Amino acid sequence: MTQPTIKIGLWMHRGLTRGSEELRLFLSVHNIDVMLVTESHMREGQRIFLPGYSTYHVFHPSGNSRGGASVIVRSSISHSPQPPISTNDRQIAYIQLQTAEGPVVLAAVYLPPRERWIRAEFESLFAVLGNKFIAGGDYNAKHAWWGNSRACARGKVLQEVVANGQYQILATGEPTFYSYNPLVSPSALDFFVVNGYDMRRLNVQTLHELSSDHTPLLADLHAMPINKPPRSCLLARGADIERFKAYLTQHIDLSVGIQGTDDIDNAIDSFMDILKRAAIRSAPSHQQNVESSRQLQLPPIVASLIRLKRKVRREYARTGDARIQQIHSRLANRLHKVLNRRKQSQIDNLLENLDTDGSTNFSLWRITKRYKTQATPNSAIRNPAGGWCRTSREKTEVFANHLEQRFKALAFAPESHSLMVAESLQTPFQMALPADPVTLEEVKELVSKLKPKKAPGEDLLDNRTIRLLPDQALLYLVLIFNSILRVGYFPKARPTASIIMILKPGKQPLDVDSYRPTSLLPSLGKMLERLILNRILTSEEVTRAIPKFQFGFRLQHGTPEQLHRVVNFALEALEKKEYAGSCFLDIQQAFDRVWHPGLLYKAKSLLSPQLFQLIKSFWEGRKFSVTADGCRSSVKFIEAGVPQGSVLGPTLYSIFTADMPNQNAVTGLAEGEVLIATYADDIAVLTKSTCIVEATDALQEYLDAFQEWAVKWNVSINAGKCANVTFTNAIRDCPGVTINGSLLSHTHEYKYLGVILDRSLTFRRHITSLQHSFRTRITKMNWLLAARNKLSLDNKVKIYKCIVAPGLFYAIQVYGIAARTHLNKIRVLQAKMLRKISGAPWYMRTRDIECDLKVPKIGDKIREVAKKYHERLDSHPNSLARRLGVAAQRSASPRSRVRRRLKRHHPQDLLDRALT
C-alpha cells in the first residue's frame, strides 16, 4: 500500500504573473499539493487564477512589484491562512494545513539580501511559525550545511540557530541558484527549515524545470492530508429520477394521522428518511472524479519543449557552459511564447462559444457573475484577545461566540414596561376562525417558483430535489402543513441554521465585526414560512398596522419611490426658500437585536391565534452554527433577532417597527411640513420651514420621540453613524440636533439608498462616484470587452446593457434632474465604452455608434425610464407614492402646487427633458 504523501514545491520566480501558465503545468505534471513561491513580485490587487488551487500572497511594504512571497495550496485540502508578515527585511506568507496527525504550518519565506540578521531575529521568526512547521524559501544565506562552498555572515547566524535549537535543514546539497552572470558561482540559497518532524519522513529533490535562475525543489512529506468535506445535496447529480419518484410514490403513506406536536415531528422525520432511502437507491453507480478530469493535456510541442529544456538545464548545471545557458534561455522564451499562444487560443475559443441561451448553460452570464458580486476572502481573523485564529475551527468558534452575543436583546426598556409585555402575552385569546387550509395547487405553485440553484440547509434537501417530488410526496407535505397550521406548532425537527459569514463591502477582512451573517435554512422550512407569510399578508390588521412610509419588504415598492419622496420634499423647500432639516438614522444591528417578547406583543393584536402560536413557536429553541473552510462551530442559541435569509424575517421586522413615531410626533409644524421615509432599517426624517430654528426644533422633537420609542422597545441607535444634512441654497446650516444626548455630525451630503444627496441636490458628488465605480467595473472586465478579442459584438453589447449600464442608471428617474453638465459625464462614459467594445475609428460619430449598436442615448434612456416609472406611480398601491406621479401632480388644486422659482428640473419634468 502506497504511503500517503503531501508534495511541497519551492521556487524563487521573480514575477509570478508572467510565469503563471508554466507554473500551472508544473503543478499538474508533478501533482503538487502546496507550492511555496518567493520573489513573486505581486502588488496589492493583483491576482492569478490557478484552477483547483487557492493562493495567498504577501506583498512588499513599499507597494512596488518587488520581493513578496506566495503560498499556493490545493483547494480541496483543509487549511487556514495565517496573517502575512511584510517588512523591509522579510516577507512571509504561510498557512496551517490539516493532517491526520495534527496541523502543520507551511511557509514561503523571502529574506532580501543586504539586510543584517542576528540570532534573536531568526529565533523570533521561527517562534511565530509555531512548534510544527516547514518553512521553505530564499533565505539568501550561504553555508556548507546546505551545499555552499563557503559561508556568509547570515548563513553562519542561521547555522548557529539551527545547530543549537530543535530546527533542521532540508536541502539537496546541490546549488539552486545559477546566475546569468558567468562570473558568479552557483550557490544553494533555497532550502527548507523544518521543526517538529523526523527527517526520515521527508525527502527532497531538485527539479531542473521552470524558467528562472533558481531551480525548484520538490519535497515529499509522508503524512495524510485532511480534505474539506465536499459540497453535497440529498439527490446526487446523475441520479435515476424516475426510480426516485417511483420509490417515493410507493412508500409514502397518506393515511397517517397527525394530531399533535409529536406527530408532526415524527411525520417530518419519516418523510426525510424516505427521501434519503429513495436518493440512495437512485444514486448513479459511478461518479466522475472531478480532480482527475481536470488534469492538463499537454500538446506534443509543449511536452517536447519541456523535456528538451529540462535536459539542457541539467547539462548547464553540470558543466556551467555559458553557451548552454544561452540555449536554455532561448528554449525558455520559446516555451513561454508557446504557452501564451495556447492560453490565448483557449480564451478565444471560450469567448467564441459564449452565449446567453440555455444551449450553452447561459455561459455568458455565468462568466460575468464573478464581477457582479464581491468575493469573501479566506483571511485570518483576530480573536477577542487580540491574537490570531490559527485554525478554521478557531475561526468558526470566534464567529459563533460573536454572533451569540449579537443575537441577544438589549435591556433598555423600563422594568414596568417589560412586565406589562410579559403579562399581555399570558392573556388568553378570543375565539377566531382558523387559517385558510393549504391546498395541493398552492404547494405546486410554490414549488414551481423555487430557485433550483439555492444552497441547501443542513438537511441537504435542496430546491432541485423538491421540484422533482411526485404528487404523492407533495400531498404528504400538504397533510403536514395543514396539521402545523391547525396545531400552531413550528416543527423542531431541524431548527438549526447553518450560518456563513460574508464580508461587508469596503471593510477590513481581519476583524470579526466586518462580516455579516447569512443563514442557510432548510428548504422545507422556507416553504412553510412562505405559506405562513401568505396568510399573514392577507390580514387587514397587518396591512393597516404597517405604516405607509415603510417601503421596505413590500410588493411593488422600491428604493426609487422612497428616494423620490425625499428629493421631492427637499426640492419643494428649495423652491419656497425654506430650510429642509434632515436626519438619517442608523439602527445598530437592527435585524439581529429584535426583542422577541416585544415583537410577540405587537403581533398578538394583529394575528389570529393559530398564526400567533406559529410565530411564537418559530422563535422557541432556535439554534445556529457557523460554517467556514469546511469546519462547523458548536451549536449556539438565538435569543433575539429575525433570521437573515428567512422568508418571515423581513415582515416580522416591519411589524416590530410598525408603531415607530410618525408625523404626529411633531407638534410645531403642519403634517405636510414633516416627512418620514423608511426602507427596512434605513430611516430618513425631514422637516422644513422658512425659519431655520423652527425646522431644527421640529426635527429635534421627532428625534426625542424616536429615542423614547427606541428605549421602550430595546432598540439601539448608533449616533456615530447618524447624519444631519440641511437642504438649502443658503449658506447657513441648521443648528445641531442630538439623540440620546449625542450631537449628530452635520454633513453636506449623505448616501441614502445608494444615492448621494448633497445639500443643494445637484447630484454632482453622486455622478462623480458613478464615474469611479464604472471605471472600476470596466477595468475588471477589460479582457471580455476588448475590441480585438473573439467575443461577438452582440454579446459585448449585452454585457454593457445588462451588467455595466444598470449601475449607471439606477435611480436615474431621481438623479436625472441634475444639470446637463453633470449628465454629460454619463454620456461620455457610455460613448467611450461603446467606442471601445466596437473598435470604431476616431472619426465615427458617437450617435452613429449608438444607433448601430441599438443603445439608446442618455437623454432617450432618461425619458424611457421616467415614462415607465411614472406609469407605475399613477397606479401604485401606496397613496404616498401615487402623489408623486404626473397624473396626481396635474390633478392637484392650483393652491397646493408648488410655484416654480428656480431654473431647475423636478423628477416629473424628465418625461419631456431633452439632452443635446
From Swiss-Prot:
InterPro entries: DNA/RNA_pol_sf, Endo/exonu/phosph_ase_sf, Endo/exonuclease/phosphatase, RdDP_mobile_element, RT_dom
Region of interest: Disordered: 890-916
Pfam families: Exo_endo_phos (PF03372), RVT_1 (PF00078)
UniProt biased composition (Basic residues): 896-906
EC number: 2.7.7.49
Boundaries of every Reverse transcriptase domain copy: 483-757
Listed GO MF terms: RNA-directed DNA polymerase activity
Biased composition (Basic and acidic residues): 907-916
Nucleotidyltransferase in keyword set: yes
Coiled-coil portions: none
Record entry for activity regulation: Inactivated by sulphydryl reagent.
Temperature dependence comment: Optimum temperature is 26 degrees Celsius.
Cofactor (UniProt): Mg(2+); Mn(2+)
Keywords: Nucleotidyltransferase, RNA-directed DNA polymerase, Transferase, Transposable element
Reactions mediated catalytically: DNA(n) + a 2'-deoxyribonucleoside 5'-triphosphate = DNA(n+1) + diphosphate
More info: Prefers poly(rC) and poly(rA) as template and activated DNA is not effective.
Name under which the protein is recorded: RNA-directed DNA polymerase from mobile element jockey
Annotated source species: Drosophila funebris (Fruit fly)
